[in-house]
């Protein structure tokens, strides 16, 4: 996997949702396809890695902000939350009322000013393929170009984002990790009694 560390100057992009700033300190992971730019906040990425280190299947919800400018989709994933009411398996991915109640309760408490950007899924031992169940679950509950699926696959814990294109899900190729204080995510982690190494994680780049 290719990792490139650099600083990106603050920019403004003008799209149909107005002006917005791009993160300043970022780390590129893999090669992006140019049509989507996915920015994953570092606390979120660290939380997902730890949460998905379990041997059983697990799912999480992704929150943040979606923007569109100059033909490019921008996903700013600022938060994530474990879905405790779901026990995912390759042939069993159910988003029932209990799941959505849990998700909206978490949003109301921690991430009130953010939107659902998609979901994250780990199925240890299953492999990297997206089966019919995974694709159907995404299209039924996260349809549209403003939602994404984050997969953590295999023993190597390969991380891949997927977005909707041509009637199915396709890999975005790569993504960006960015750094900020992210108090809402820290508050969620503290209340969830996460590992201290996750809470006190210090990145090599400064958080503004």
Tell me what each language-model feature is.
Residues 117-126:
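Histidine-centered catalytic micro-motifs
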């Amino acid at each position: 996997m290719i990792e490139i560390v650099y600083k990106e100057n603050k920019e403004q992009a003008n799209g149909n949702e107005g002006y917005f700033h791009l993160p300043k300190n970022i780390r590129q992971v893999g090669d992006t396809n140019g049509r989507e730019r996915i920015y994953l906040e570092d606390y979120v990425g660290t939380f997902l890695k730890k949460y998905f280190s379990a041997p059983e299947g697990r799912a999480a919800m992704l929150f943040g902000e979606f923007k569109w400018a100059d033909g490019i989709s921008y996903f700013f994933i600022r938060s994530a939350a474990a879905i405790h009411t779901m026990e995912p398996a390759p042939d069993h991915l159910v988003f029932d009322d209990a799941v959505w109640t849990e998700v909206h309760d978490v949003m109301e408490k921690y991430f009130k000013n953010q939107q659902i950007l998609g979901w994250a899924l780990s199925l240890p031992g299953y492999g990297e393929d997206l089966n019919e169940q995974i694709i159907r679950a995404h299209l039924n509950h996260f349809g549209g170009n403003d939602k994404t699926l984050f997969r953590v696959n295999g023993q190597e814990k390969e991380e891949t984002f997927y977005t909707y294109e041509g009637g199915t899900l396709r890999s975005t190729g790569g993504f960006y990790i960015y750094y900020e204080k992210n108090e809402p995510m820290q508050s969620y982690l503290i209340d969830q009694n996460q590992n201290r190494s996750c809470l006190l994680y210090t990145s090599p780049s400064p958080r503004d």
